[in-house]
Amino acid sequence: MVVTGSPPIPGTAAVTSAGLSAPRQSGRSFASAENAFSPITRFLAFALLSCVGLQALGLDFADETVTQTLCAALLLLGLPHGTFDWQLLHAGLQRSIYTFALRLGLYLGLAAATYLAWQIAPIAALTIFLLIAIFHFAEDWESDVILANSSATKPKFLALAMPISIITLPALSHQEMLRSIFVMLSGDESAVMLVDVMILLAPVATGVATAKIFMDCATGEISRGIAGICVLSAMVILPPIAGFSLYFCLYHSPLHFSTGWKQLTVDQAKYSALIVAGLTIGGLAIAALVYSFGQGSTVTGNLVATAFVTLSLLTVPHMIMPSLVSRRHSSL
């Protein structure tokens, strides 16, 4: 049987009376129509249908003006969800000023190293960014449901298949456009080889991702399943940047932002809005610097590079820092 009550936002676990996360038991019944979809999934589906309608009416989502707008949206709507990294820094400050300085230095060092990698070996930096993004996005699709007649949850590789499919599907549906984007990001024609690899991975990853979507729906996680359908559809129907923007801005970021906000204490929540706003402005300042040093031959090229390079500067420390801090014998 599926645990009754309002389901948690996808990617979060049910909470027991002891305040600890606990897996949810799956079954054959489905959630009610009223509770089947989270607000995030509903808005995602509405946005996808709207985009499909606008595209049918003649709007070109690959147009330069639209692309520039989408890149701005990636920064404005995408940056806030990563600003909860300040909690790690704040926790370090509570331990000692030395720990705080060490964490801050490591965070900035990782970001600086990432930027340096883009300058020295852009294709390698792009490849690493895509790999890190896959593991990061997999968090959106991890399940906490215990399979019926079993003590196990769904295999982790199913969650990993979703972001691999999301990232590689445009290689099948918009191959030449994706090639030009990768060349634009790296400044190297050899970057098209990444698209060739994606063409090989996409069918397998999408097949596994489709199986996961069916499994999610069959085990009562309809909201996550519908979100998966919407995101994969967007990556096929819309141009690469438009499809990715839809996923990143309307599903990934809200999901992580809401999860991070719920983890705050009452006292933290009082000043978190100001801190998040301040850090977002700081992120935009970094984006402005990246843009000012851009080597793109066009405004659109520079904006695309700025959006994705800036996201990589924040994603790398965002992914690496927690694991470093959580090490049992770490001085952090």
Give the positions of each predicted feature.
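N-terminal membrane topogenic signal
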Residues: G27-F46
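Hydrophobic, membrane-inserted alpha-helices
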Residues: L48-L54, L106-Y115, G225-A234
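Hydrophobic core segments of alpha-helical transmembrane domains in multi-pass membrane proteins
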Residues: Q68-G78, A124-F135, G243-L255, A307-L311
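Membrane-interface helix-loop-helix junctions at boundaries between adjacent transmembrane segments
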Residues: A91-A101, G109-L172, V183-E189
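Alpha-helical transmembrane segments of multi-pass integral membrane proteins
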Residues: L131-F135, D140, K156-L178, D196-I213, ...
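Predominantly late transmembrane helices and immediately cytosolic-facing juxtamembrane segments
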Residues: E139-V145, L238, Y247-L264
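Short aromatic-rich membrane-water interface segments that cap or initiate transmembrane helices
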Residues: L185-I199, F308
